[in-house]
Amino acid sequence: MTYNLEFHPLALKEWKKLAPSFQQQFKKKLQQRLANPRVPASKLSGHTDAYKIKLRTIGYRLVYTVKDDVVVVYVLAVGKRENNKVYESLVSRQP
């Protein structure tokens, strides 16, 4: 089963600010995650059903949650890892 992709409004703003080359890298990984969104190695500790995609070379993270009832991968945040900024934004962005 393939999941659909949706963005939190603030995550969409963050996405649009990314350089096109970074967006392409995330798109490749998101395509894989839409087929299999629950990757145990990418699960965030301390968050219920939240996962991350890392672009290590540039230090960016994309954090998403999985909504099985509507078959959606919901992007919560996109940003740099420095000072855990991207992870702290999750508190106010739960779906």
Predicted regions and their residues:
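Short, charged low-complexity linear motifs
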Residues: 1-2, 45-50, 73
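Compact soluble domain cores
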Residues: 21-35
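A short, surface-exposed loop/turn module that caps and links secondary-structure elements
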Residues: 31-56
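Enriched for short, Lys/Arg-rich terminal
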Residues: 2-5, 10-17, 24, 55-60, ...
